[in-house]
Amino acid sequence: EFTTLFLLFSVLLLSASAEQCGSQAGGALCASGLCCSKFGWCGNTNDYCGPGNCQSQCPGGSPGDLGGVISNSMFDQMLNHRNDNACQGKGNFYSYNAFISAAGSFPGFGTTGDITARKREIAAFFAQTSHETTGGWASAPDGPYAWGYCFLREQGSPGDYCTPSNQWPCAPGRKYFGRGPIQISHNYNYGPCGRAIGVDLLNNPDLVATDSIISFKSAIWFWMTPQSPKPSCHDVITGRWQPSGTDQAANRVPGFGVITNIINGGLECGHGSDSRVQDRIGFYRRYCGILGVSPGDNLDCGNQRSFGNGLLVDTV
């Protein structure tokens, strides 16, 4: 009996003292913006956050540490109405921890270039995805650009978005309308996205709207993946994309505007001012302000010819 009690006490002691974060805890993150120490514990003093003591979510970040570009508090400030009662995402579906976890599957996302490039990429990513999921309006509390990440699924009465394909066959009864931060749509996007992230999205497309990490992964996959003749959004915002002669003739130049062209240029670009483009820019400027970085040049696409039909459905 004594041996049994001793073993039980030992188990309880070990479980109570188990590490909280980082490599010692399967990559878990600290809550409330705390730093993860090199030993796997959460805190906010020098023992946790200081140079040589911090392994993740460190002040100022480190190469490869997305937490140094966007903190939990910044995330909440940017998407401060995502849990409004009128939003599908209420209940913290779009959480900071889910975003950080998903981003870890895409080396280079938010970690490429100097701190200016990294901040611009995060601002641009959240601006474009906020436009796709916005629940805001002109006179909304805190302004129209505080309502990103409100919706999980395409609004209205969307169709099945099934294009006959041998490579990406539609599953019986499944619909491939817009879901998640980037509102990924069509079987020919769900198929390769699912293959890339290791999930069968052709048979289970609604995972993009029910699993937070998969939802973020779908958006980051689109962001990081070039689809010829389009470059990836990532390569554009980090300065890796160099316009070809064809691009230059079409006025497609590096900047936030060409990312809008990649996403929905067939509908929004090449015809002067467009309210949807301005909405994207409004989000981008706000997020750049929160992250403390200038937005750069060439923000709109009014004089750019489109790459072709957009791969996504515009939900606004």
Swiss-Prot record:
Propeptide segments, given as residue ranges: 310-316
Domain Chitin-binding type-1 stretches: 19-60
Q: What Pfam families does UniProt report for this protein, alphabetically?
A: Chitin_bind_1, Glyco_hydro_19
GO molecular function terms attached to this record: chitin binding; chitinase activity; endochitinase activity
Which positions are catalytic residues?
A: E132 (proton donor)
Q: Where would one find the signal peptide in this protein?
A: 1-18
A GO cellular component annotated for this chain's UniProt record is: vacuole
Catalytic activity, per the record?
A: Random endo-hydrolysis of N-acetyl-beta-D-glucosaminide (1->4)-beta-linkages in chitin and chitodextrins
**Class in the EC hierarchy, top level:** hydrolase
PROSITE patterns assigned? CHIT_BIND_I_1 (PS00026), CHIT_BIND_I_2 (PS50941), CHITINASE_19_1 (PS00773), CHITINASE_19_2 (PS00774)
Task: Read off the SMART domains from this record.
Answer: ChtBD1
Can you list the disulfide-bonded cysteine pairs? Answer: C21-C36, C30-C42, C35-C49, C54-C58, C87-C150, C162-C170, C269-C301
Compartments where found:
Vacuole
Q: What is an annotated GO biological process for this record, any one?
A: chitin catabolic process
Supply the induction statement. Answer: In response to infection, elicitor, ethylene, wounding.
List its EC numbers: 3.2.1.14
Q: Does the keyword Hydrolase apply?
A: yes
Which keywords does the record carry? Answer: Carbohydrate metabolism, Chitin degradation, Chitin-binding, Disulfide bond, Glycosidase, Hydrolase, Plant defense, Polysaccharide degradation, Signal, Vacuole
Q: Which domain of life is it from?
A: Eukaryota
Described by its record, this protein's role is as follows:
Defense against chitin-containing fungal pathogens.
PANTHER family, alphabetized = BASIC 30 KDA ENDOCHITINASE, CHITINASE-RELATED
For this chain, the family text in UniProt reads: Belongs to the glycosyl hydrolase 19 family. Chitinase class I subfamily.
Quote the protein name from its UniProt record. Answer: Endochitinase 2
Per the UniProt record, the lineage of the source organism begins with:
Eukaryota, Viridiplantae, Streptophyta, Embryophyta, Tracheophyta
Identify the gene encoding this protein.
CHTB2
